A protein has these predicted regions:
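Charged, alpha-helix-forming regions
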Residues: 1-326
């Protein structure tokens, strides 16, 4: 399809949004892929440092890091977002009330439109085993007694425990108190429910791409560029795509390995009812990589929730979108 022409969605498709949290760790974690990590041959630990967030994962080679792991993590954060008070908690005792989040196998399968029970179980097991082995280290802003302060979230494991109740079909994450403190001071972000239903085997980069577009739109909602993102920013957030330098060193065409896959996924996001349309901000007489990388993508979400312009210290819970994940 000629992507200079607006791609239109079918009017019958309906999209709902849920609330999630766009914390510094969450945003960094969402942009990773297996190729983002450096693996220590002796310890088996994997290391990555996206956006000044140091991430360490134990026994990395024993599990498979992919978009499914990020999707499972985001689903737990959506469930946490539904109950975690925003910028209101102070003590560890207060945070412990919201520490453990669970999801049923049936809920996960319904949410992600999965039919194969065995594959769904494997996805949850693999994802939770990775999430339970993540250590992080980063600086971030929190609010203490309604005052904005910089806090060093110094090397800790994000989950105190992961568990499975096989009889009840339940999967649990007990988040670390420090991680909850970070999340409770993060910004709330609407997220398209349809994104969880993306077929990650057919469209492995679609989830990362959708999340990046959502983050950009939400962060710039009250600015003039909420519906426009540079191609460079977009592909930098999709670590599964090869880089221009990698293609120049090896075989293959830039158009076939970077440009076309990106356009195909943007078309898919329209067809699946997440976006209304997308197009480039300019016409290309000849689409060279240099022209393409300097261009921008203009996009429109289907029924993105309207927001009010709260100031940074607002504690108003009404800024949350009503969660609806079953």
């Amino acid at each position: 399809m000629d992507s200079n022409i607006l791609v239109k969605k079918e009017e019958s498709v309906k999209v709902n949004f849920v609330s999630t949290l766009q914390g510094k760790f969450n945003n960094a974690f969402a942009a990773l892929s297996e190729r983002s990590f450096r693996i220590d041959g002796m310890s088996g630990k994997a290391y990555a440092s996206p956006n000044d967030v140091k991430i360490e994962i134990e026994n990395f080679r024993n599990y498979k890091f992919n978009a499914t792991v990020q999707r499972v993590f985001d689903i737990f954060i959506v469930k946490l977002s539904a109950i975690l008070p925003h910028k209101k908690l102070e003590t560890d005792t207060e945070y412990r009330r919201f520490q453990t989040i669970s999801i049923t196998l049936k809920e996960y399968m319904t949410l992600c439109n999965l039919k194969n029970k065995t594959k769904a179980i494997d996805q949850l097991r693999n994802a939770l085993n990775i999430i339970g082995r993540i250590h992080v280290d980063f600086m971030d802003t929190i609010y203490t007694n309604k005052k904005k302060v910089e806090k060093n979230f110094c090397y800790f494991q994000i989950a105190d425990n992961i568990a499975r109740d096989k009889g009840k079909g339940l999967y649990y994450i007990s988040f670390n108190i420090e991680f909850l403190r970070h999340l409770a001071n993060s910004y709330v972000m609407p997220f398209p429910l349809q994104a969880f239903r993306i077929d990650l085997n057919r469209y492995p980069i679609a989830y990362q791409l959708c999340r990046r577009l959502t983050l950009h739109h939400n962060m710039n909602y009250f600015k003039g560029n909420a519906n426009s993102i540079s191609v460079k920013s977009l592909i930098d957030s999709v670590s599964l795509l090869p880089t221009h330098q990698e293609i120049l060193k090896g075989a293959g065409q830039v158009s076939l390995r970077i440009i076309k896959p990106l356009e195909k996924v943007l078309d898919f996001l329209v067809e699946s009812g997440i976006l209304t349309d997308w197009h480039y901000n300019q016409q290309f007489s000849k689409k060279t990589y240099e022209q393409w990388i300097d261009s921008a993508i203009v996009f429109t979400f289907v029924d993105f929730p309207k927001r009010k312009n709260y100031n940074a210290t607002s504690n108003d819970e009404s800024k949350k979108v009503t969660p609806n994940i079953g």
